[in-house]
Amino acid sequence: MVRSMQSENKYRPLTAKQALQLAAPHTWAASVCPSLFGICYSRLMGFPLGPFRAAAVLAACVFLQSAVNTLNDYVDFVKGTDSASDNVEVSDAVLVYGGIDPKSARNLGFLYLFAGLLSGLAASAGAGPVPLLIGAAGGATVLLYSGGPLPVSSLPLGEVVSGFVMGGLIPLGTAACADGKLHPEILFYSLPLIIGIGLIMMSNNGCDIEKDIRAGRRTLPMFLGRERTLKLYRFLTVFWILLLFVLPVLLTGRRGFLCGVLLLLFARERFRNILALQLRPEQRVLQMKGIVAANIFGNGALIVTLMAAVLMEALHA
């Protein structure tokens, strides 16, 4: 009993700054970009998505992303997967360096999940069962991503699942919140988001091959090996870039050429950086910063292009 009390007393209280660090705002692009894409797509297609629903969708996505990040950090720490020797930044490893009770992080993760659930219910209120079913699939993925007997993040399908759920289901659910209908065609135009987000996980797993082998994880890079993973990574990156040039034109006509201009001006160096790296453990911090930046500036160019198209249509209405 005394030992248990001493163990509890050694922990520091969770601060607001640490709660924000566990939410990992630098990764929110993986949820914000798909949400904004779905909002802009809905406006372009004439779906009745009002500002309240749009804001609620955006909030739900941010809270669910925060829940994924927090619960994933908790599970990795409890399992001993994350340590100070694993090339992680101090601000990105609160449980490793912060001295807080892991249970506090777990509870915070569930709080983020609950907030995301409430925001999602607000966004889909009165829209029928379709957005609720899509949201339920996303919520189940959040819970199964790091937890359960067979976590999604530890499977070879992790990249596909994370890319499809974040990059595909978020836009699909956003459009469904507008009119209660299923719009599967949005998944085609969401391909840059699906690939970009999937590559975030591949960046992490590609750098962590040796660490994941020790932890008993069966990730895709572990099966492929670093050399073949790197080839696949670079192929998908080039394909992602090509889609960013082509799909906006297919979706918005000549206005879509703006995306290519923005890519050349702001995203070229970001893509060049991630193509030059080799998914080595010692490059993990650079690799993760690079792929997040590529998502922000690459998929961000797509979002800005759609926003401009929406604005131009509003001005000509």
What are these regions (language model features)?
Residues 84-126, 221-253, 292-298:
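Multi-pass membrane catalytic core of lipid/isoprenoid biosynthesis enzymes
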Residues 2-56, 60, 149-153, 158, ...:
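Topogenic membrane-insertion module of multi-pass membrane proteins
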Residues 29-38, 160-175, 222-226, 288-302:
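Small-residue-rich segments of transmembrane alpha-helices in multi-pass membrane proteins
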Residues 63-88, 199-221:
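Acidic (Asp/Glu-rich) catalytic motifs at the cytosolic membrane interface
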